[in-house]
């Protein structure tokens, strides 16, 4: 970490500024961490993990970040099931019948 980059403690986690964004680390020394671009979203993500809530309408990367930061097995299983459900669903593609294909 370079000199002058900030570090903040929030609800049992450390938010450290890196060159490309922020790193959230569990304060207990276990080494669990994840990387996020925005400091405000870091705090929201920590709130979700501490309160055991599943973040709405987020990418699989964010859900996996919640798994990395949490130590609650029920919470981890709930998010893992959501990720698996998303992977099993097929993406519905739009087909324009009037467009000519060559």
Question: Where do the model's predicted regions map?
Answer:
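A short, exposed loop/beta-hairpin motif centered on an aromatic-Gly-Thr core
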Residues: 26-45, 49
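Short amphipathic alpha-helical segments that mediate assembly, nucleic-acid/protein binding
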Residues: 39-43, 59-63, 72-81
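Short arginine-rich
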Residues: 48-59
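Active-site-proximal or metal-binding-adjacent scaffold patches in catalytic folds
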Residues: 66
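Intrinsically disordered, low-complexity mixed-charge
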Residues: 101-102
């Amino acid at each position: 970490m370079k000199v002058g980059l900030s570090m903040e403690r929030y609800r049992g986690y450390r938010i450290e500024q890196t060159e490309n964004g922020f790193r959230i680390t569990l304060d207990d020394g276990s080494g669990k961490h994840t990387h996020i671009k925005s400091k405000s979203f870091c705090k929201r993500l920590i709130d979700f993990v501490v309160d055991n809530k599943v973040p709405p309408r987020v990418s699989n990367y964010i859900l996996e970040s919640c798994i990395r930061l949490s130590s609650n097995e029920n919470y981890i299983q709930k998010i893992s099931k959501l990720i698996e459900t998303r992977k099993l669903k097929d993406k519905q593609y739009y087909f324009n019948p009037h467009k000519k294909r060559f």
